[in-house]
Curated annotation (Swiss-Prot):
The keyword ATP-binding applies. Transmembrane segments: none annotated. The gene is gltX. The keyword Endoplasmic reticulum does not apply. Belongs to the class-I aminoacyl-tRNA synthetase family. Glutamate--tRNA ligase type 1 subfamily. Its EC number is 6.1.1.17. It is found in: Cytoplasm. InterPro entries: aa-tRNA-synth_I_cd-bd, aa-tRNA-synth_I_codon-bd_sub2, aa-tRNA-synth_I_CS, aa_tRNA-synth_I_cd-bd_sf, Glu-tRNA-ligase_bac/mito, Glu/Gln-tRNA-synth, Glu/Gln-tRNA-synth_Ib_cat-dom, GluQ/Sye. Catalyzes the attachment of glutamate to tRNA(Glu) in a two-step reaction: glutamate is first activated by ATP to form Glu-AMP and then transferred to the acceptor end of tRNA(Glu). One of its GO terms (cellular component) is cytosol. This is Glutamate--tRNA ligase. Keywords: Aminoacyl-tRNA synthetase, ATP-binding, Cytoplasm, Ligase, Nucleotide-binding, Protein biosynthesis. It comes from Nitratidesulfovibrio vulgaris (strain ATCC 29579 / DSM 644 / CCUG 34227 / NCIMB 8303 / VKM B-1760 / Hildenborough). The lineage of its organism: Bacteria, Pseudomonadati, Thermodesulfobacteriota, Desulfovibrionia, Desulfovibrionales.
Length: 463
């Protein structure tokens, strides 16, 4: 099925949010699975709300997620002549007509229909008047008066709409601009789109678009409407649920493969498998496993999944990824140094911001180590500082200052003085780290180096 063509068509009226990102991922995976094409189209016909900064942000988010597209980027704002040519074709064939009813009169018609318990719609006053162009006039589709529209949705199964409930929708506004449904149908048809996967908030547009496909003589694509993503409380997802725009997740320190993996699982499944490499998703993705029930967004699970990917990433690659976050903490460190540190600390972080912060005490000079007051009071007592001084002497005497040497020096001090490890280690740890936590003490000492470790111990003894 190399003839499969899918598309993603965001409006540049805001940053790419996770619902839109999931739609893009589904369409990208379907195209890549069948060796087809994935088209990216910017729906910027709303000139007042569309902003270049949002277009740039959407494109950057797509690239960050690894969603490449085929062919040129399409802008609807550059295709008005094409849309108008198809509107003219509909007028010539009798499938559309000019309407001069002002908006307030149309709204009055809708109110009258509501009062009668009917679907609010335009009453077709201008359908048979044979009007032509004129100021304030719009072009409407001449929809069939009766019948049903039935299609096989890839997610929902058979879906039917009564044509009598549909409006004679506007195709060209009074200012000459084409409307959303007209532009979408013309674009999808002329770009050869075969499959349209989108959120089920678009389901009500589908019968209108099918009427346009039929009026223009275009072949219908396969439609699939995936349920919206809900919050943990099963209400519409919003920022209060912890949902962010894709660009915010990047700034927050998530890895793109984690976000892609998580969003795919919010609406698609392959048995009980939770973790997928991108290549696996391309291989296994299919519309038959798209879920018809809405999934709930769980920020904790996303954090857990991102932590998994942090720990699976090579030290060199993870160092490259965390470098800008370390720089944001105020440190000028090269990636080779970070590649030594991240294996010790990635178990203690679930995102790159956390990873940069938990490594902070390893990057500051001895004079700037921040001491936790409670840890100092508990561990750096007079006896504790005496043990720190003793360990300091043992470390200073080492010929080779490496992990094994540091471990032996501490062990020899403990054994030589008839002590237990727990009597010595907490004080030395607080002296080196500034707190009780952290990875293995000898590992950290070896990475800090002799001079830095001795300076930290000297400072702690002097407290």
């Amino acid at each position: 099925m190399s003839n499969v063509v899918t598309r993603f068509a965001p409006s540049p009226t805001g940053h790419l949010h996770i619902g839109g990102a999931r739609t893009a991922i589904f369409n990208w995976l379907l195209a890549r699975h069948f060796g087809g094409r994935f088209v990216l189209r910017i729906e910027d016909t709303d000139t007042e709300r569309s902003k270049q900064e949002y277009t740039d942000s959407i494109l950057a988010s797509m690239k960050w997620l690894g969603l490449d597209w085929d062919g040129d980027l399409i802008y609807q704002s550059e295709r008005f002549d094409i849309y108008n040519s198809y509107i003219d074709r509909l007028l010539e064939s009798g499938h559309a007509y000019w309407c001069e009813c002002p908006p307030d009169e149309v709204e009055k018609m809708r109110e009258e229909a509501r009062a009668k318990g009917l679907k609010p719609r335009y009453n077709g006053r201008c359908r048979s008047r044979d009007l032509g162009p004129g100021d304030g006039r719009v072009v409407r589709l001449k929809a069939p008066a009766e019948g049903r529209i039935v299609f096989d949705d890839l997610v929902k199964g058979t879906v039917a709409f009564d044509v009598a409930e549909l409006d004679d929708m506007v195709l060209r506004r009074s200012d000459g601009a084409p409307t959303y449904n007209l532009a979408v149908v013309v674009d999808d048809a002329t770009m050869g789109v075969t499959h349209v996967l989108r959120g089920d908030d678009h389901l009500s547009n589908t019968p209108k678009q099918i009427l346009l496909y039929q009026a223009l003589g275009f072949d219908l694509p396969r439609f699939g409407h995936v349920p919206m993503i809900l919050g943990p409380d099963r209400k519409k997802l919003s920022k209060r649920h912890g949902a962010k725009a894709v660009i915010e997740y990047e700034q927050y320190g998530l890895l793109p493969q984690a976000l892609v993996n998580y969003l795919v699982r919010l609406g698609w499944s392959h048995g009980d498998q939770e973790i997928f490499a991108l290549e696996e998703l391309v291989e296994k993705f299919g519309t038959e496993n798209l879920n018809s029930s809405a999934a709930g967004f769980d920020p904790d699970k996303l954090e857990w999944l991102n932590g998994h990917y942090l720990r699976e990433t090579s030290p060199e690659e993870l160092a490259r990824l965390v470098l800008p976050f370390v720089a944001a903490e105020g440190f000028d460190v090269d990636a080779s140094r970070l590649a030594q540190l991240v294996p010790l600390f990635r178990e203690r972080a679930n995102n790159l911001v956390e990873l940069a912060r938990v490594m902070r005490f390893m990057l500051v000079p001895a004079a700037e180590v921040e001491y936790d007051a409670a840890a100092v009071a508990k561990a750096l007592t007079e006896e504790g500082r005496r043990h720190v001084a003793g360990v300091r002497e043992a470390l200073a005497a080492l010929g080779t200052f490496d992990r094994e040497g540091c471990e032996k020096a501490i062990h020899d001090y403990v054994e030589g003085n008839g002590l237990k490890f727990k009597q010595v280690a907490p004080a030395v740890r607080v002296a080196v780290v500034g707190a009780m936590g952290g990875p293995g003490l000898p590992d950290m000492m070896a990475l800090l180096g002799r001079d830095d470790v001795l300076a930290r111990l000297d400072r702690a003894v002097a407290l």
